[in-house]
Each structure stands twice: as structure tokens, then as C-alpha cells.
Amino acid sequence: MTRLPYYEIHSFADPDVPFSGNPAGVCVMDAFPDDTVLAGIANSNNLSETAFVVARGKDQWNLRWFTPAVEVDLCGHATFAAGAVLLETGAVRGDTAHFQTRSGPLSVSRSAAGFTMDLPQVGLQAGKPDTATRNALGLSGHELDAVFDIERIHGARYQMWVLADEDTVRDVRPDLGQLRTIGKNVIITAPGDAVDFVSRFFAPASGVDEDPVTGSAHCSLAPYWADRLGEARLTARQIGPRPGRLEVEPAAGRVTFHGHAPRYLDGAIILPDA
């Protein structure tokens, strides 16, 4: 049997809200096995994302991400979780874990209040609100500020829908079957009541009905709201059934994330010998 160190981290947890943040699995390996093994582990974990990390040099790691259904090109909260694990367990000797990924070099560092992470911004283009998506989101008759198309980063179409207020975002009850049929992942967002902005993220096209706190979504949200509000550093909350809180700073084509990453469990995944 093979034992693989395994951790579950609640990325971007709100310190004031128990059981908040986005759960991510982190599996530390000597080498990547066959992709079917990685996919099987992620499917068995049944978390929105599982991160797999393999050492490649001093404080340097290869990193891959899998949902229960597919491998993805970028996952912010699982990157945040992987960095937290490596820094807290002493696997990283310095203060920063450096990753090589499908989306290029990424990093997670210690900070006074938790951890910071650096990800690339993901661009927006003006889009149009189509009837099928509007109906799937249950937004017929609701005011829309804007709709944007987002670069494909999970192998699926992405859109960001900007709504009027926080209550509208909180009250959305999407028809996930319709969104899955459309083949579209959707971020909904609005100005926040007690923070700069709020959001939710539905990703049935990538095998995740609703992701609790989504780093990659904030790669588009952060520059949009920074430009709209004229702020350099913003506080954000994702307000689905399992909320989370983070701070974001977009600059020079990147987004710096600040947040907490408490460890929920650690142990081992036990695989039978081939």
C-alpha cells in the first residue's frame, strides 16, 4: 500500500464565522502518478478542488488541480491551501512556496495576518445577457448593471453578471441543470453592504455546482471592482451557503490575495499497490 500525506484546508475562512471558507484537499506526492489516479482521488474526496504537489527543488513545487470531474488550468483557493500546508509543515524552508502550474508561476507567502498569494488577472470583455442564462439564474425581471465574458480558464465558457445589490446576489437560486446544459460557469456580483463587493460562483460545467470562495473568480472580480470603486485594496465576501472573506489588490496584471487558511484535518490517503 502507498500512503500519501493529505490535508484539508479551509481557504479564505472568515475568522468570525465557524466552518467558513472553501475546503480544498492537498495531497503531497513524490511524483505524479497516472492521471486516472489523480482524478480518482479528487472524485473520492468530492471537494470542489484537490491540489496535488510534487517537489521540484528548494521551495519549488509542481502543482496540479482537479475537481471531482476534470483537471483545471487555475484554482486559487487550492493554490492558497497548498501553500499554507507547505509553509506550516516546514516543507518550505523560506517564507514563500513557489509553484509551476498550467497557468505559469504562482506563489504563496506567509503574512502577519495569515497568507498572501499572487495570481494573474483574467480579462473581461463586454458580453450580452442571454435569455437562457438569465432564466437559469432566476433573474428575469431583475436589474443588471453589466454582463462580461471571461477568458476560458476551466475549459468552459465563463461569464460575470453584475447585479444591483447584495440581497439579489444572496437570493439567487439557480437551475444548475440548465446551466450545465448551457455549458457555462457564472460569477454573480454586486456592491457589498459591509465590504467592497460580494459574489457567488456557479460552475456546473466544471463539475462544481457552487464553489464557496473562488480565487480564480477574483482574478476578474478584483480588477473590475478596483476600477469601478477607485480603490487599490478591496475587501470581498463570497456569500453562498458557505461564506468566506478575503482582501485583494490588483496591480500590473496580477492580483495579490490576503486571507486565512485554517487546517481542518490531516492524515493520509491509502492507495493499493498497482
Go through each PLM region and give its residues.
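Active-site proximal loop and beta-alpha junction motif in alpha/beta enzyme cores
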Residues: M1-L74, F80-A274
